[in-house]
Amino acid sequence: MAKKVKAIVKLQIPAGKANPAPPIGPALGQHGINIMGFCKEYNDRTASMAGTIVPAEITIYDDRSFTFITKTPPAADLLKKAAGVEAGSGTPSKSVVAVISKGQLREIASVKMKDLNAVNIEGAERIIEGTARSMGIKVE
């Protein structure tokens, strides 16, 4: 018989830098799981992706055991890295902070494809292009 799921917790944590301090400690501690065990396992899995934020979806069971899956970095972070900017525009409809090429857009869309609700790469590109537009990044 399958274990009964107690909770599903979603966190965005810098790769290889999980520690029991807030926000991770309180989010997981209230469900009674081994926080250090999670941090160690997460850091081992994400050590190769240092410098990026990697979302994790942690499934916590009634017997206080857990499993987790890591997702691809947020599209906004990938776009900022490709454009070479620290932050998006405060007024995206009026000011453009950077420009990225269609090739860079396709590369980001192919990385994010498995996490997006898109049928093909063109659909994924449109989703990522919308994110870029809302950040004040122009695609040419």
Curated annotation (Swiss-Prot):
Organism of origin is Dehalococcoides mccartyi (strain ATCC BAA-2266 / KCTC 15142 / 195) (Dehalococcoides ethenogenes (strain 195))
Recorded protein name is Large ribosomal subunit protein uL11
Q: Which SUPFAM superfamilies match?
A: Ribosomal L11/L12e N-terminal domain (SSF54747), Ribosomal protein L11, C-terminal domain (SSF46906)
Please describe the quaternary structure of this protein: Part of the ribosomal stalk of the 50S ribosomal subunit. Interacts with L10 and the large rRNA to form the base of the stalk. L10 forms an elongated spine to which L12 dimers bind in a sequential fashion forming a multimeric L10(L12)X complex.
* GO BP annotation list: translation
Q: How is it modified after translation?
A: One or more lysine residues are methylated.
Q: Which gene encodes it?
A: rplK
Span of the signal peptide: none
Q: State the source organism's domain of life.
A: Bacteria
Residue ranges annotated as coiled coil are none
The record's section on Gene3D superfamilies has:
Ribosomal protein L11, C-terminal domain, Ribosomal protein L11/L12, N-terminal domain
UniProt keywords, alphabetically = Methylation, Ribonucleoprotein, Ribosomal protein, RNA-binding, rRNA-binding
SMART domains in the record, alphabetically? RL11
Q: Which family does it belong to?
A: Belongs to the universal ribosomal protein uL11 family.
Asked whether the keyword Ribosomal protein is assigned, the reply is yes
Q: What is the lineage of its organism?
A: Bacteria, Bacillati, Chloroflexota, Dehalococcoidia, Dehalococcoidales
Provide the function of this protein.
Forms part of the ribosomal stalk which helps the ribosome interact with GTP-bound translation factors.
